[in-house]
């Protein structure tokens, strides 16, 4: 239909639909400036959302740093937009004076392509293809990363990361705590 995006799952139609909806895939994320605190993995911001802090991880197997949650756009995921990671918000006070979250990071290379292609292949009535379905947690070969934030007073934030290797062998994990100022100067990036 002239002037409308293709509906099929072939790459040309997917690209057209992304442009119409103004969304971009995870692969573009590392080329775009962070805009908010929630852009980062297990991130937090100050009250004005000016100073942001988050964690980046690298297991020496992935081709890129793991600094943002991997997800599928509404056009890639068979149920619609969908994060394909294992993370859990465990605790928080109403004032956020204490917060705790858990993230599970595979020791194997993250299956970006497999998750995208398999979910594209499936229809809306099919079950989702999740990270665990790709076998990356087999034999408990993953790291658990526990993030805790606590306010010592209104202007003092304490941060603690506790990492545990659940696998049967030693494995390398690089932790990169990252602070940045929110991008307010260029909204088109």
Over which residues does each language-model region extend?
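Anionic coordination/interaction segments
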Residues: 1-189
